[in-house]
UniProtKB/Swiss-Prot annotation:
EC number(s) from the headed UniProt entry: 6.1.1.7
Cofactor(s) recorded in Swiss-Prot or TrEMBL: Zn(2+)
Name of the protein in question: Alanine--tRNA ligase
Main location: cytoplasm
Cofactor binding description: Binds 1 zinc ion per subunit.
Record NCBIfam families: alaS
Length: 863
């Protein structure tokens, strides 16, 4: 076999299958278009809808090199030659086209003829009941029977993913590395009986069955092929090395780690593990952040944070005490950037996010490790409450706590960890959402089967309809008089709250009555329910009515919805492609947009975004709406949210040259109708997620009027011109600070400060205050010594559930007493720390309830 680089292997695979009639598709995102998955874990994930029969394939033959991420075995990464978080999966797929024979023959052809792998180095396994696969390997390929292992369902049968679904046998191809590890004495080594010698390099899955609820298999009308081969394993094979970490995919990264840490690779096994962990994790970190995932305490962000913190801890084991991971990003980008240009485009952003996260974690890690050691010293073990405290207070992910415990040989019991986690999250979760849905709307069973409300609100703000169902107190009724009820009409122009856009409001009128529409929602797919209040007359089932949407409210909402799309586009342009929508609210009076970004926007960035949006508004660009297939929409570059469900036909809202999104909301027909766009706030929602609130149209005008009124009031109160207001306010602020200081010192100086005389004649002046900030205590201590001339001053203040402390020692006592030592002694008792100089020191603590004990034993702390 000739040596081949990773680039050559990747290119050879794709070219080979292109010649076999496959469409070569680029790698999909690591963030799948699938709400059931956090990450793309295999090459087949982007094609799940096709395998599941939900979508018709555009191409029947496809080949890809897919970037993937898995953390299920993260504790093994670095300890074995082939476990990884981020990896690349080569794969060829057939959707109802070729099947077993071609899949096996082409895999063999690629391995033996393109890569030049000696046939004697290859073994295979097949499902024990799959005679067809056995026959192809034996008769078509010519592989001897002894090199075809028949294995059970656990080893050679894939799926289904749940209790039911597509599934089928598979065949695995193994490469014999030649290493005689774990082979039984007197027996020939095979993939079934050796440990580590044979490496699985390719898995060919034959999806030919559907498993029903009873576990029975039924032949599928359309059979599919799904194959996966790890590029990292191919590289190890073609580069003549046993470990994936010795390939050209990892060596440049490992070299960079050696430079930064000063630790040589392959000099010490424990340190080698740490180097491998960092090398692996840096690939995952770089790709995740470049795709807009940021460290946080939930979902993808939590997984990223775990990976970063695990890499950091191994850096600490190599002697690193400052942020350093961000300095490895360029090595990853240099190696992988030609194939995945997104990591080059996002390189500076990745470094910035990573550096900030490293700094944040280092501040808490040292304290967390001290607490870990204290718990172990006291209890000899870690329990669920301890593990949660380490996570919640000190930022140690549970997995990291478990790993540290294993290394130290400490027993861990975390059975109740999730209970503590759930309790913490309880208040922030809308935990009753699913229960509410299941409990309510039973009255919908009264509707005709397959009933759908006809929505006419894209074209009309007024329409005629018929009352199909009336419900009160969760039960269907025949009529309603002066009541608040929920009503289903045959058709409606009212938009139901969905996709972040609030519902329409308006009126319903009939021959002798009228009602207000207060809220509209979709209770089940296609069934729109109107929550109304009958003002006059009696509304009856079967009644013909006229439904009128509040025109001004709808138009204001439309302005804000289109502006939200423009804002999304502007944020991507100003901040980068990593920006993704993380939530929104579109109301008539304002819009709110949550998005992924790693830090607050500067004033300059906010102005850039505002200017861009207003430029697009001024250009009066026609807004286009069209319906197309989901596949065509995605191919055209449309922005879709992975959390949303889309049908076969989707609605695309496009502002040509600016924005293109899948959206079911209502929009203006021309950007000029928005009028004016103004950002009113920008803030953090959670780690890695920012929020912008903005107004448009008449709301902007109202905002400007209110601001003008405020400025006029300030001018009158301060007796200043508009251009003098800033200086005048700053001057007032300084005066207030000075007055507060004087007031605080004056008030405290009047308090009775106790005095105690020591055996050596030295006097100790001490006092405890309420709600006095630490910054004022030093001045009070100065005043005491000015008045008393000599002595030791110890002042404590309970402020915001914490304790602040200052100690001051007069010059004549410095040979006997050290303020820094006294402060540290007291702070330790109060659960804190501190220090300073011999004549003056400051400290803090977390246990104000222990102050009384400190005062009772004051002399002890002076020693």
């Amino acid at each position: 076999m000739r040596y081949m680089t990773s680039e050559e292997i990747r290119e050879a695979f794709l070219k080979f299958f292109e010649k076999k009639g496959h469409k070569i598709l680029p790698s999909a995102s690591l963030i799948p278009d699938d709400p059931q998955l956090l990450f793309t874990v295999a090459g087949m994930v982007p094609f799940k809808p096709i395998f599941w029969g939900k979508v018709e394939p555009v191409y029947t033959r496809v080949a890809t090199c897919q970037k993937c991420l898995r953390t299920v075995d993260i504790e093994n990464v670095g300890k074995t030659p082939r476990h990884h978080t981020f990896f690349e999966m080569l794969g060829n797929f057939s959707f109802g086209d070729y099947f077993k024979e071609e899949a096996i023959e082409w895999a063999w052809e690629f391995l033996t003829q393109v890569l030049g792998v000696p046939e004697e180095k290859l073994w295979v396994s097949v499902y024990e009941e799959d005679e067809e696969a056995f026959r192809i390997w034996n008769e078509k390929i010519g592989l001897p029977e002894k090199k075809i292992l028949r294995m059970g369902k656990e080893d050679n049968f894939w799926g289904p993913a749940g209790p039911t679904g597509p599934c089928g046998p598979d065949t695995e191809i193994f490469y014999d590395t030649g290493y005689s590890k774990g082979c039984p004495e007197g027996e020939e080594c095979t993939p079934a009986n050796s440990e580590g010698r044979f490496v699985e390099i390719w898995n060919l899955v034959f999806t030919e069955y559907y498993q029903d609820e009873e576990g029975k298999l039924h032949p599928l009308p359309r059979k599919n092929i799904d194959t996966g081969a790890g590029l990292e394993r191919f590289c190890a094979m073609m580069q003549g090395v046993y470990s994936n970490f010795d390939t050209d995919l990892f060596q440049p990264i490992i070299n960079r780690i050696e430079e930064l840490t000063g630790v040589g690779y392959k000099t010490d096994e424990e340190k080698d593990v740490s180097i491998r962990v960092i090398a692996d994790h840096m690939r995952a970190i770089t790709f995740l952040i470049s795709e807009g995932v940021f460290p946080s305490n939930e979902g993808r962000g939590y997984v990223l944070r775990r990976i970063i913190r695990r890499a950091m801890r191994h850096g600490i084991l190599l002697g690193m005490s400052e942020p350093f991971l961000y300095r490895i990003v360029d090595a990853v980008a240099e190696k992988m950037g030609k194939v995945y240009p997104e990591i080059v485009r996002g390189e500076s952003m990745v470094k910035e996010v990573l550096s900030a996260e490293e700094s944040r974690f280092l501040k808490t890690l040292e304290q967390g490790m001290k607490v870990f050691d204290e718990i172990v010293e006291k209890k000899g073990r870690i329990d669920s409450e301890d593990a949660f405290k380490l996570y919640d207070t000190y930022g140690l992910p549970l997995e990291l706590t478990l790993e540290i415990a294993r290394e130290k040989g400490v027993e861990v019991d975390v059975k109740e960890f999730n209970k503590y986690m759930e309790e913490q999250q309880r208040k922030s979760r809308v935990a009753l959402g699913d229960v509410e849905f299941a409990r309510r709307y039973e009255y919908l069973e009264e509707l005709p089967k397959d009933f759908r409300t006809e929505f006419t609100g894209y074209e009309k703000l007024e329409d005629e309809g018929e009352v199909v169902l009336i419900a009160k107190n969760e039960k269907a009724v025949e009529d309603a008089t002066e009541d608040a009820v929920e009503v289903v009409f045959s058709k409606t122009p009212f938009y139901a709250e969905k996709g972040g856009q609030v519902s329409d409001t308006g009126t319903v009128e009939w021959e002798d009555g009228k009602a207000l529409v207060e809220y509209v929602f979709e209770a089940s797919e296609g069934v729109i329910v109107h929550r109304i209040k009958v003002l006059a007359g009696t509304l009856r089932r079967g009644q013909k009515v006229v439904l009128r949407v509040d025109k001004k409210r709808r138009e204001a909402t439309m302005r804000n919805h289109t502006a939200t799309h423009l804002l999304h586009a502007a944020l991507k342009k100003v901040l980068g492609d990593h920006v993704r929508q993380a939530g929104s609210l579109v109301a008539p009076d304002r819009l709110r947009f949550d998005f992924t970004h790693f830090k607050g926007l500067s004033m300059a960035e906010i102005e850039q975004v505002e200017n861009l949006v207003n430029e697009w508004i001024m250009e009066a660009i026609p807004v286009e709406v069209r319906y197309t297939s989901y596949e065509e929409a995605v191919k055209s570059g449309v922005v879709a949210l992975f959390t949303e469900k889309y049908g076969d036909v989707v609605r695309v809202v496009e502002v040509p040259g600016v924005s293109k999104e899948l959206c079911g909301g209502t929009h203006v027909s021309n950007t000029g109708q928005i009028g004016l766009f103004k950002i009113i706030s920008e803030e953090s929602v959670s780690s890695g997620v920012r929020r912008i609130e903005a107004v448009t149209g008449f709301s902007t005008l109202e905002l400007l009027r209110n601001q003008k009124k405020l400025i006029d009031q300030l001018k009158e109160i301060l007796g200043a011109r508009e251009d003098e207001l800033t200086d005048r306010v700053l001057g007032l602020r300084e005066k207030v600070k000075e007055l507060e200081k004087k007031l605080s010192q004056g008030r405290i100086s009047e308090e009775k400060i106790a005095m105690k005389q020591l055996e050596d004649g030295a006097r100790v002046f001490y006092a405890v205050f309420e709600d006095v900030e630490a910054k004022h205590l030093g001045g009070i201590a100065d005043n005491v010594l000015k008045k008393e001339r000599e002595g030791i001053v110890i002042l404590l203040s309970k402020f915001e559930d914490k304790v602040s402390l200052v100690v001051k020692v007069s010059e004549n006592l410095l040979d006997k007493y050290d303020a820094s030592s006294i402060a540290r002694n007291i702070a330790k008792e109060l659960g804190g720390s501190g220090g300073g100089r011999r004549n003056f020191a400051q400290a803090g603590g977390r246990h104000p309830e222990k102050i009384r004990g400190v005062l009772e034993r004051l002399e002890e702390f002076l020693r």
